[in-house]
Amino acid sequence: LTAGLFYAIKNAGYGTGILCFELYNAQILSDLQDSRNVLSENPNILEETDSITESPETILQSLQSKISKAFPSSAEVNVNVKYVPTALEEYLSPAFYLIPAIDNFSENTIYINQGHSLTDINLFTTLAHEGYPGHLYQTTYFANTDPDPVRSLLNYSGYVEGWATYAEMCSYYLSPLSKPHASLLQKNNSIILGLYAVADIGIHYDGWSLEDTVEHFATYGIDDEAVIADIYNYILGDPANYLKYYVGYVEILELKKDYMKQQGEDFSQKEFHKELLEVGPAPFEVVRKYMIE
């Protein structure tokens, strides 16, 4: 499967730096250390609730308003929240955004799957991933720049899903949770996604067996072999799926670090996001050429 993995990687737009185990493991370890620091400084944090009772429509409106400080103004569009038919709940994702027609991006739809347990903070961050400042926001923002129509034929899932994952991680800090609680949950989400992505590369590039995968997760204190077997079989059947989320996310984090160094005291989150959004979906090596001098 190695050749197929490389094809999936290149097609997603990751460039040549995809198999940077050290980079991904370093990100996981950094998130682990941040989690330890939060727990050390806030020993009672696990007793805090992550209850959020707003409706999906209210959450989306709240997110659209809250992102204005760090993200450029969104395109004026309509958003409809719909629910997956009961007969399809077993087969579809917890939530998903439908890409609008190329000639009418003002009408947008997000589907929520009530067959999945999307409660509290998970619903909030999922709507951020699919809506604001995630897929819906990125798609309509770029469409509003009047790009060459050929861009609609190109698919760079590393950029698209990397952006949505980055947006999801940012959304924890836009939620009603305390900052330490938001940080702990965000780091945990990042760690789990990172472990899956590293396993994805290990299985399909290095040929990890189930035993190798069990050992990988055990290194980080995850030792339920039945759960790991399910993860292993899922990854085995869908090569490179987790990479478009995690590697795309880490590429954006690394790009942001370099952009901050370049801008120095003039760094602006809103300007960084604006430049990244205006380049639009592309291989990260191309994105860098436009953003890093």
Q: What are the residue ranges of the model-derived segments?
A:
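N-terminal maturation segment of proteins
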Residues: 1-293
